[in-house]
Amino acid sequence: MPRISSRTLLPILWLLCSLAAPIAHAQDDEQVARLRAALAAPARPAESKALDASRKPIESVQFFGVETGDTVVDMIAAGGWFTEVLSAAVGPSGKVYSQNPPFLVQQETETALHTRLGNVEAVHASLAAAGAENVDAIVTAQNLHDIYNGYADQPGGEAATVDFLKSLYAALKPGGVLGVIDHVGVAGQDNKALHRMQPQQARDVLIKAGFTIEAESTVLAHTADDHTKIVVDPSVRGKTDQFMFRARKPG
């Protein structure tokens, strides 16, 4: 077999990289344009639009690495703000599973949302039961603190949170991403009452569930938040200090 010298190989590799970069950039531009159009759509509720400035949807999608054509999950979607963002991010060739436990389902809101979005499937059970497997990415925003601290009749705790995260790990394809956003809590505060979580606690349970924490973002950081108020307090609502992790399933 003839050998290829480095003098021959390096220009070929450079050419391939130079061709790939404009294609990737064009795809990114198309996704951003699609997101901006969806966020500004007349049919989108005003209350959803009002959240955009503080939640930074485009920056979040880019940080998590969600791509056109991906299959993704909005885990514990509540009213579906992130479901709509992810729907636009993956485009018509992608799919979004919008998961809510039964007690969180807002049927009228959910029906209206899914009627507008053609690539969304509602899930009211576990991801495994719904057949959501080998997905590219899962996003759960402002939920992990409740799993950890306990909610309704769920006691919470580290073990329960690791089990929850392991169920997400199982639904992801090898190399898939879990995006986590939550309100920052600090030691010495009643974070259960405040609906907050210490970032290190989130790191610990993610690692114990098998994930690698690939990156952290400060795009949702708010230094004016002193972490002592409940997240719905008018003085901090929509302006809480939040952590954002991109965790990856190895493979």
Which residues does each predicted region cover?
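Conserved class I S-adenosyl-L-methionine
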Residues: 68-78, 105-107, 152, 176-203
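Short glycine-dipeptide loop
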Residues: 68-69, 92-93, 172-178
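S-adenosyl-L-methionine
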Residues: 105-132
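A short glycine-rich, Lys/Arg-flanked "PGG" loop and its adjoining helix->strand segment in the class I
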Residues: 87-88, 155-174
